[in-house]
């Protein structure tokens, strides 16, 4: 039996944040996990004992995340915690190039990135938590992600916002990850294969938030253009495969003026495509 969005939300509202919502729901068990994996085109075998061990690590992981966000922001956004709790992270641990699932790696004590194949990675959950809260997501928001990767960041934001878009430039990865949202009932996620440098201009009205999950050498002009007044762009900026990358927060006020703030040091794989071929426009590289 697959879990619908309504069932996920019902599980969340029935419990407390200290226990993940899917763990509370009778709908998420080993059989549901295997069915969702199969329906997303990713077969796997896992024992009851191994699946139970994964679930036992969820609550400690959520507690670590809450403590981390409080240490960074002064408070942990309940919507961010709830969004994480509503998702089975083990479902997203998959190497698409090797066609190999690794659910037992989920909810690791020391958060770290995991290979997805094709040069991409599932980011560590604490880094994803930080960027999610930095987005300041709200229930009526329309959000664009550049760099779908595993799909976990898009899925996480989809639990909080009205509509989530995501673009992946690596075609075999993007085509495969397009299949993983429906089996979890994530109907407000729309993805496509393309170059995130150009954003998603067909979306009428633009975006409340744009989150970039790869390191850009400068801010793509299209992303600023597609940001709504009052919108927010969260983007890592720095040179490819070098230290010294930083997260930047750009905001656009109601008059269209854009301001930026340098945030924490980060390390991401580079934005490819047009970013590598197009000279930086004047003023697009933060000082």
Please identify what each model-predicted range represents.
Residues 132-253:
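Conserved nucleotide-cofactor-binding alpha/beta core module
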Residues 21-25:
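Boundary at the C-terminal end of the N-terminal hydrophobic targeting segment
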Residues 238-287:
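Active-site capping/gating segments
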Residues 27-139, 267:
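Class I SAM-dependent transferase core
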Residues 1-15:
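N-terminal secretory signal peptides and thylakoid transit peptides that target proteins
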């Amino acid at each position: 039996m697959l879990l619908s969005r309504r069932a996920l939300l019902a599980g969340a509202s029935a419990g407390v944040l200290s226990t993940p919502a899917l763990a509370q729901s009778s709908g998420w068990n080993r059989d549901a996990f295997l069915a969702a994996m199969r329906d997303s085109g990713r077969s796997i075998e896992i024992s009851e004992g191994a699946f139970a061990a994964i679930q036992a690590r969820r609550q400690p992981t959520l507690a670590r995340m809450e403590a981390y966000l409080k240490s960074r922001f002064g408070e942990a956004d309940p919507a961010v915690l709830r969004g994480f709790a509503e998702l089975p992270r083990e479902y997203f641990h998959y190497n698409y190039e090797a066609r190999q699932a690794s659910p037992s790696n989920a909810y690791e004590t020391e958060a770290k990135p995991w290979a997805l194949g094709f040069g991409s990675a599932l980011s560590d959950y604490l880094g994803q938590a930080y960027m999610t809260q930095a987005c300041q997501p709200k229930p009526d928001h329309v959000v664009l992600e550049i760099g779908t990767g595993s799909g976990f960041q898009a899925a996480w934001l989809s639990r909080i916002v009205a509509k989530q878009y995501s673009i992946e430039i690596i075609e075999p990865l993007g085509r495969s990850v397009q299949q993983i949202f429906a089996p979890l009932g994530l109907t407000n996620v729309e993805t496509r294969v393309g170059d995130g440098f150009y954003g998603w201009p067909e979306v009428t009205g633009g975006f409340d938030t744009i989150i970039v999950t790869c390191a850009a050498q400068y801010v793509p002009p299209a992303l600023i253009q597609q940001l709504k007044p009052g919108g927010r762009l969260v983007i890592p900026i720095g040179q490819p495969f070098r230290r010294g990358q930083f997260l930047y927060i750009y905001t656009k006020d109601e008059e269209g003026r854009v301001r930026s703030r340098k945030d924490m040091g980060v390390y991401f794989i580079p934005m490819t495509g047009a970013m590598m071929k197009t000279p930086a426009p004047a003023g697009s590289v933060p000082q």
